[in-house]
Amino acid sequence: MNPQELKSILSSGLLSFPVTDFNAQGDFHRAGYIKRLEWLAPYGASALFAAGGTGEFFSLAASEYSEIIKTAVDTCATSVPILAGVGGATRQAIEYAQEAERLGAKGLLLLPHYLTEASQDGVAAHVEAVCKSVKIGVVVYNRNVCRLTPTLLEQLAERCPNLIGYKDGLGDIELMVSIRRRLGDRFSYLGGLPTAEVYAAAYKALGVPVYSSAVFNFVPKLAMDFYHAIARDDHQAVGKYIDDFFLPYLEIRNRKAGYAVSIVKAGAKIAGYDAGPVRAPLTDLTSDECDMLAALMDKQGKQ
């Protein structure tokens, strides 16, 4: 799949990122991950991101990363394209990128580098180096320490033909409008704020109709139904989903930092697809919080 074909795929439909399965000892659980992918793939996501932020990329060893990407690519070979999360320091990100390409990933989601303060010129140089290390398509994720401007993105687009996507995790509407207007159809644009459904209607109005769904991991039917309501501009249905599910969900998610990942793993366990615990420094939901989530999920009906 060439970068432009990937761009076309990412320009419509719902995207998601499977959680990564760990056993009770916290090690990668391949059989559970395969079962998860086989369950989720038929629901109709346009693409899946393996070892992304919700997949706890930041906590994976290099050897685990290779096994996770290979498992995802092999399991979904005939059903849905797999993009691999990559990140960290530049040379580390390049190693991950080249390994994901070797293993058959159709594209990359370039996560922000970790911790080190840097100018956005430096961040742009980091993005360019990763893009030029591979031939497959790359989506850059503006979030946290990565705050690329329209001018820098335009320069990167000229230098890196395989940079085909922009994912927004900042929620800076002025910046998003500026990027969308400046870059036009050069990129596919993805909404990437935590629990992106809450912002989906607003982002669609900005020209960003595609987003990645975390709740697809445990209420996939609801996630797809909500996406279709967004796509057909059914504001009444969208409002009902937000009132009945997403706002109560946020009340649980917002209780602790890091729960944007932890609550997804809790939901997967309640749905019968236990992915094991999150790894430190994240913490799992308490039993009371899991009960609250289970009651909320039960109200949504069979998935």
Swiss-Prot record:
The keyword Lyase applies. It holds the Pfam family DHDPS. SUPFAM superfamilies: Aldolase. HAMAP family: KDGDH. PANTHER family: 5-DEHYDRO-4-DEOXYGLUCARATE DEHYDRATASE 2-RELATED, DIHYDRODIPICOLINATE SYNTHASE. Gene3D superfamilies: Aldolase class I. Its EC number is 4.2.1.41. The keyword Ion transport does not apply. This is Probable 5-dehydro-4-deoxyglucarate dehydratase. InterPro entries: Aldolase_TIM, DapA-like, Dehydro-deoxyglucarate_dehyd. Coiled coil: none annotated. Belongs to the DapA family. It catalyses: 5-dehydro-4-deoxy-D-glucarate + H(+) = 2,5-dioxopentanoate + CO2 + H2O. It comes from the Bacteria. Keywords: Lyase. Pathway: Carbohydrate acid metabolism; D-glucarate degradation; 2,5-dioxopentanoate from D-glucarate: step 2/2. GO terms for molecular function: 4-hydroxy-tetrahydrodipicolinate synthase activity; 5-dehydro-4-deoxyglucarate dehydratase activity.
